[in-house]
Amino acid sequence: MKLLQNNIFSPISLATHQSLQIIDVFDVPWTKTIELESHSSLTYLVVGSDADIHIELFTKWSHCSCTIFWLFISDAKHPVTGSLKVSLKHSQTSANIELISFLHDWAKLGIDGSIYIDPYLDQVHGRLLEQNIVLGKNISLRTLPKLTVSSHNVTAAHGANIDTLDQQKLFYMMSRGLTKQQSQTLLVTWYIDYVLGHFTDISDVNKTQIHTILAP
């Protein structure tokens, strides 16, 4: 399976002891399911614009883990909606989720991220963070991170942040000779590079493709 895929809708199923890194790029509506077997590990990135995206992931046995990132861009012509549901059904499993969006003028974004931890589980970790980077005006944003925990011996956290290129940051960057557009580009680039740093085998060509899709 290729590291980077364009508009591939087939399910992802990791076998026992399999470790996999996948980047999905989508610009069309789609739905995808992911299954994790025992002792498997998935690092997964979704890059999207102008899309209606829905993912459901669930564990099929214990001792498996996933790290999932979403990178979205939205403006007046590219509304984005989506949902990510992660179901941890077995002990000694973990999910680390970060949903990051770049919102330009007249952006429309509706994202529901959720982690469900079943009853009677032990040593389970769940983390869900939604980060919305505001780069424009007149933005419509609906975000609802949800964490449902039905076990006691677990660690779990969730939250949502809204970040802007505030006036202090902007003044500092412009005092160094950068325009507002260049300052926004630096901010977006930092987030993208942070995510891509989790993918050890990504090529420079793939990096350039992702930066181009998400460029301000």
Which residues fall in each region the model found?
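Short, well-structured beta-strand/strand-turn elements
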Residues: 178-184
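Small/polar glycine-rich anion-binding or flexible loop at a beta-alpha turn
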Residues: 185-193
